[in-house]
Amino acid sequence: MRKSYRIKKEAEFQQVFETRNSVANRQFVVYSMEKPQQPHFRVGISVGKKIGNAVHRNWVKRRIRQSLLELKPHLKQDVDFLVIARPRADGISMTDAKRSLVHVLKLAKLLDSDYSEE
């Protein structure tokens, strides 16, 4: 995913947190904020230190990024959102990660209504 699709600055993370629009499941928490003037979505990924060591945290981030890349055409475009991994996300398989992410994104109403898992 290109850098223009990422949220990196702490101030931008805080702005999304402060909207308090969140949904969660066992593996992920998603915070979202509408940005109507924005041409495409932006995402921030956070994996805390409760999830293993740096290798495990980066592994989880790669799984999240790949799942979002596959879901990109179906995601709502005028929004900033954060995906926060919970400790239960450690060791999750790619298919389970995508399934869990689809579930939480549907709860947050960030996926197109016509999306169905292949």
Curated annotation (Swiss-Prot):
Report the GO molecular function annotations.
3'-tRNA processing endoribonuclease activity; ribonuclease P activity; tRNA binding
Q: What is catalyzed by this enzyme?
A: Endonucleolytic cleavage of RNA, removing 5'-extranucleotides from tRNA precursor
Keywords of this entry: Endonuclease, Hydrolase, Nuclease, RNA-binding, tRNA processing
Query: Which SUPFAM superfamilies does the UniProt entry name for this protein?
Result: Ribosomal protein S5 domain 2-like
Keyword Lyase in annotation: no
Q: Is Disulfide bond among this UniProt entry's keywords? A: no
Q: What span is annotated as the signal peptide, if there is one?
A: none
Taxonomy, superkingdom:
Bacteria
In short, the EC number is 3.1.26.5
Which terms does the UniProt entry file under GO BP? tRNA 5'-leader removal
InterPro entries from the UniProt entry: Ribosomal_Su5_D2-typ_SF, Ribsml_uS5_D2-typ_fold_subgr, RNase_P
A single GO cellular-component term from the record reads: ribonuclease P complex
Enzyme class (EC, first level)? hydrolase
Record-stated family: Belongs to the RnpA family.
PANTHER family linked to this entry: RIBONUCLEASE P PROTEIN COMPONENT
NCBIfam families registered for this protein in UniProt? rnpA
**Oligomer status and interactors:** Consists of a catalytic RNA component (M1 or rnpB) and a protein subunit.
Q: Could you identify this protein by its name?
A: Ribonuclease P protein component
Question: Which species expresses this protein natively?
Answer: Levilactobacillus brevis (strain ATCC 367 / BCRC 12310 / CIP 105137 / JCM 1170 / LMG 11437 / NCIMB 947 / NCTC 947) (Lactobacillus brevis)
What is this protein's gene name?
Answer: rnpA
